[in-house]
């Protein structure tokens, strides 16, 4: 029978959460962190392959989850690749009918009952991690610790620090009925010089606060190291079995810090269970209400599902889930009522604003008519401006023309006066020579004829010379173009390693072009001689005095023959090298793109850290202002006391010693208040950061546990369906063999 892979499989044998891997991101308490760093000694990051595949129940919607994804290069001692979380049915420790259910969620993954007895974790927080690293990492998760034994930054050797954390631990044990539950009494000196029995009882009680279903069955030196490693205690490498067997003496500060860390972890889990971190998550934009509803559904449904027997049918098992599904739907509807009310208010505001817009549109004048009239006026204005500019240009043009004509008139009048004077002079000279009018006409006619003949000869000579110079200039231009082409060819040959013949691509061939032309001759001097109309450039254009160059003799290489074939072969070779270069370039570009993507991821990580730094600075400034205010108040109080002291000194000389003692006490109290304010500021600052880190990491842990179980259920269904198909295929084959 086919089933939806997104739902629980009711048909297969029941199994617990024991085979679900534990990728816990349980955070450190504030006392285990350095004051100067808010991200040091954190949990190992996940890899980038972790994504949500599908919901456990497709019929119920789930709100969008925040994705604080960052790149990482490793897990906590595991390979950085994808962790194998897909397991076969045989890997379940409770697959057989003989396996029992020792707890609500027994948590070890084994293939036989013997290994099950060794792995007896019962809480969802105590499953050992057997896979690789995961990828959905918040920027609040911890980074991998450095190689070697990490150094504890807490001043555990300080007597005052020991007294403080011991008092906090003692108060926590007293307020939570330690003596009643463990039937072991505590004294004021229990946490100063404890016995081995005191440590064992306190450790077991604190761990039961974290994992109530765990049972201690071995000696403490064998139980404590795996538990600390599983809880990811940052300094568990510095604790040996021999030290656990003798916790007193010099080793006690280390174990006192470890017990205080367990206490803070238990307190954090209690606060998270009571929802004290929900407001902080909401302020950061993370809605955990939906996660709480789904978690309550999963825990309740899984608990009821475990109550059924192995022989319970599918319908009865499905009926067990119906009340939980209905309750989850009701809780989601109740949570969505706030958003529905906000939507209704926004819809009402939207309708009111739309009504106002419509009213304003009705009362407003016709904008289309006004726009049309405005465009017409703009066109008229532009036309008048163009007309004014045109008329102004014509005025300037006519004024300049009038001035020019007046100058021409004055020049013409002066020339006319000079011509009249010349005519009068010529007439006087003719009268003195005694020439007649006929003689003058004949001489003028002869002069005109000779002048015309000279002009014709000169014009023909000029035309011939012009044609010669044009041809010469054309030939010179062609020669210069040819020289430029030869120079360009040789330059390209040098650039492409073809010239000289010893170049890389020449292969012993000569590719350098040269022109077989004469050089300019500067031996003939024309100084003092008859000027020649033939330029010296003509010497380079002629191979002989009256013969030019033959095209085949002008160049020293056969371009169309040998050179062209060699260049074609070289071009093919270069094309092949170019293709190989393009392929290599594409590979390098792909590598560059990958590097850019990695840089973008690192840049986003830096931005997240910068945002976190700014938040810490704002918190520091706020605490600084509070401390400053307190200090000012203390200063005012001190000044007031000093005035009273001076007054009392003036009036009562017999109480001088008493007032001096009071002043000393006041100063001591002021110093204590200052120290206490500084300590309180640091503690609050660290606690705020730790709370935010803890709740986000714990949320990621819960989410990942659900996702792993979802993937496990999907794999089991796929394997079950695959097994049914294989059985159907084997049956016909057996029949044929018979």
UniProtKB/Swiss-Prot annotation:
Residues 329-492, 582-689 form a coiled coil. GO terms for molecular function: microtubule binding. One of its GO terms (cellular component) is chromosome, centromeric region. Keywords: Cell cycle, Cell division, Centromere, Chromosome, Coiled coil, Kinetochore, Mitosis, Nucleus. Residues 20-73, 108-129 have a biased composition (Polar residues). Residues 20-151 are annotated as: Disordered. It is found in: Nucleus; Chromosome, Centromere, Kinetochore. GO terms for biological process: attachment of mitotic spindle microtubules to kinetochore; cell division; mitotic sister chromatid biorientation. Belongs to the NDC80/HEC1 family. Component of the NDC80 complex, which consists of ndc80, nuf2, spc24 and spc25. Acts as a component of the essential kinetochore-associated NDC80 complex, which is required for chromosome segregation and spindle checkpoint activity. This is Probable kinetochore protein ndc80. The gene is ndc80.
